[in-house]
A protein has these predicted regions:
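A Trp-anchored, charged/polar loop motif used as the substrate-binding/catalytic surface
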Residues: 41-45, 139-155, 196-206
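N-terminal, active-site-proximal structural segment of metallo-dependent hydrolase catalytic domains
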Residues: 1-103, 317-323, 332-340
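Active-site beta-strand/loop signature of hydrolases that rely on acidic residues for catalysis
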Residues: 11-12, 47-73, 106, 153, ...
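Structured beta-strand-rich core segments of catalytic domains in phosphoester-bond hydrolases
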Residues: 64-171
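Metal-dependent phosphoester-hydrolase catalytic domains
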Residues: 1, 67, 113-116, 144-146, ...
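Short catalytic/ligand-binding loop motif for oxyanion handling, primarily in non-cytosolic enzymes
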Residues: 17-19, 67-70, 99-102, 173-175, ...
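A solvent-exposed, charged loop/short amphipathic helix patch at secondary-structure junctions
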Residues: 19-38, 173-193
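Active-site-proximal beta-strand elements of phosphoester/diester hydrolases
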Residues: 5-18, 32, 117-118, 162-175, ...
Length: 340
């Protein structure tokens, strides 16, 4: 751990589940991983290098290994931590799902503890439940569910500092299964509508924490950003803007909210096969409440090309490109028992 700071990270690891067998042991062979053109051995070794370089005290793993009939997320991540020789050897998770893409926290038990603390209220039920909202403005209540229920944790440092963390992976807006242009529009709008409902649900839980004066972090893959697609105009605001509101802060999201931003950050890099080119997107965030912001934490996107120090480190740069289609985001927070 860096002197007098905690480092928290969020990292979406593309198809982490494909690297483990039914006993949650890593498969280190030369067969394809879930990543296009990358073997399981190459992805695992790249992930080891990235996690070691992060040297974080806690890492929210989005698309964490599967929990199912035989497999267990906690056991798989513990095995990965041993393989990578990480000090983040403990794992916390909340509600499992059936997508093979879990949400879990790897953390250093010598630095902090993590406890699953799911909440429920009349206007924001527990995240594994059902949220009722009129999505279509047709005076009929729709039932909304999270395919990947957000992870609610209470983090307590050895010095007694308490942070509340919500880790999220919102619904993708991508029009999977579309057959033509009309399908693309219909599915995209339906997916955005559902994602916005998830954002409202999440925002209500956040407001509950903030009303109680909790120091709050909201992190993960929100699958959205201001101005990211043309359908946003139909709904007025992006999911990110709904979640962030006026009382949370993420400097990268703030840049996107500026009407004439010139240099746009990105946390993910995807390949457009139709046009044979890569494109970036800002999808991953670490939002903090006001007292945490006042402590002057430091954000960093571990982008292999945009970060000069990473670009000059060829081994780390290549590892980031092999490990996932997303890049980690870190937050260095002053390790003080009492925040300003």
């Amino acid at each position: 751990m860096r002197q007098a700071t905690y480092r928290l990270a969020t990292y979406n690891v593309e198809w982490f589940a494909s690297l483990f067998d039914d006993e949650d042991q890593l498969i280190l062979d030369d067969k394809p991983s879930g990543r296009y053109g990358v073997t399981r051995r190459a992805q695992a070794e790249a992930l080891r290098q990235v996690f070691q370089a992060l040297d974080a005290d806690a890492i929210l793993v989005v698309e964490a290994p599967n929990t199912g009939h035989q497999q267990r997320t906690v056991r798989a991540l513990e095995h990965f931590a041993q393989f990578a020789n990480l000090r983040t050897s403990a794992v916390a998770m909340g509600f499992a799902n059936d997508t093979q893409q879990e949400i879990a926290l790897l953390y250093d038990p010598a630095v902090l503890s993590a406890r699953h603390t799911p909440q429920s209220s009349s206007d924001a039920p527990q995240f594994d439940g059902v949220f009722e909202l009129d999505l279509d403005v047709d005076e009929q209540v729709d039932e909304v569910r999270f395919s990947k229920p957000p992870l609610e944790l209470e983090l307590t440092s050895k010095s007694g500092q308490v942070l509340h963390l919500i880790g999220a992976h919102l619904k993708s807006k991508a029009p999977h299964g579309a057959r033509d242009a009309d399908d693309v529009m219909r599915i995209s709008i339906a997916n955005r509508r559902k994602q916005l409902a998830q954002a409202i649900w999440l925002r209500r839980r956040m407001s509950w924490h903030l009303e109680l004066g909790h120091d709050l972090l909201v992190m993960g893959d929100l699958n959205d950003g201001p101005g990211l697609d043309e359908y946003e105009a139909l709904f007025g605001r992006s999911s990110v803007e709904i979640i962030m509101g006026e009382d949370l802060y993420d400097p990268h999201a703030q840049i996107l909210c500026q009407p004439r931003a010139r240099s746009l950050p990105s946390t993910a890099r995807f390949f457009d096969r139709d046009n044979e080119r890569y494109f970036g997107a800002l999808l991953d965030y670490i939002m903090v409440s006001q007292r945490l912001r006042n402590a002057q934490p430091r954000w960093r996107i571990w982008h292999p090309f945009d970060e000069a120090t990473i670009y000059r480190d060829a081994a780390l740069r290549d590892a980031l490109l092999l490990a996932s289609d997303h890049f980690p985001v870190t937050l260095d927070v002053p390790a003080t028992a009492t925040l300003p």
